[in-house]
Regions:
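Rossmann-fold NAD(P)-dependent oxidoreductase module
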Residues: 22, 26, 122, 171
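Rossmann-like NAD(P)-binding element
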Residues: 53-103
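General beta-strand structural signal in soluble alpha/beta enzymes
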Residues: 56, 127-131, 180-182
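Short, conserved loop/helix-junction motifs that constitute active-site signature segments
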Residues: 83-88, 122-124, 147-149
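NAD(P)+-binding Rossmann beta1-loop-alpha1 motif at the extreme N-terminus of oxidoreductases
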Residues: 2-51
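Active-site-lining helix/loop region of Rossmann-like oxidoreductase modules
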Residues: 150-232
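Rossmann-fold NAD(P)-binding glycine/threonine-rich loop
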Residues: 95-146
Length: 232
């Protein structure tokens, strides 16, 4: 998996729900080859994927053929992802913790770590980047705009490797949004439920302001205290 030129030509999406389908449609419209894997046999989603310019496949196919992989499945299922197959892959974590679908999970709501760091710990050897997670799927579909368009909305990105972050930023730009760097992977907690940026459908300047306000927000203080960065 991967490309020596460090560009994405084939994009894999694991998860064929609303978010995965919207991202597949946007990526296909932007000229990417898109492979989507659902929870069942590829034949079950093949007609729907063909209709939006994507193809249906398996996780194994995605691992073998895609230059980057988006995770668009319920977060509670992340341990089911095949770490060995995704070793070395650029993995874009678009998942969030929802107690309604994931159940009550203390491990997924611990302020000491972002959920993307949990995904990275499971996917040993993968290159995990947090992105495409804080905006709702309906807004993603409705708000995508060409570069330079007035009122273009922004998507935040958190990751540890500058090259991988740049790769994902280019993808976000192609999908129709201005990329905003949030910081290292641990900063992905600023994009999770409970943070101001979660659910944000705003432009680049507004999103940057939200991220800058996080340390002094109620959620930011809880996180800082849990991480030992502020006294209890």
């Amino acid at each position: 998996m991967g490309s020596e030129e460090r560009t994405i030509q084939t994009l894999g999406i694991i998860g064929a729900g609303r978010l995965g389908t919207v991202l597949a449609r946007l990526a296909a419209s932007a000229g990417y080859q898109v492979i989507v894997a659902g929870s069942g046999a590829p034949a079950l989603i093949a007609p729907a994927m063909r209709a939006i310019g994507a193809s249906a496949g398996t996780i194994s196919m995605i691992a073998a053929e895609a230059d980057a992989v988006i995770l668009a499945l319920p977060l509670g299922r992340y341990r089911m992802l095949p770490a060995e197959q995704l070793h070395g892959a650029v993995v874009i974590d678009a998942m969030n913790y929802w107690w309604g679908s994931d159940g009550i999970r203390d491990d997924l709501s611990d302020p000491r770590t972002s959920t993307s760091e949990l995904v990275q710990a499971h996917l040993v050897g993968a290159r995990v980047i947090k992105a495409l997670s804080h905006m709702g799927y309906q807004d993603l579909e409705d708000e995508a705009r060409p570069v330079g368009s007035a009122g273009r909305k922004a998507i935040a990105i958190a990751g540890d490797d500058p090259v991988d972050v740049a790769l994902v930023a280019a993808l976000v730009n192609d999908l129709g949004f201005d990329p905003v760097m949030a910081g290292p992977l641990s900063a992905g907690i600023m994009l999770e439920p409970g943070a101001e940026a979660f659910g944000a459908d705003v432009d680049e300047a507004q999103l940057r302001e939200m991220l800058e306000r996080f340390p002094t927000s109620q959620r930011g203080i809880i996180v800082a205290r849990a991480r030992g960065e502020l006294p209890l």
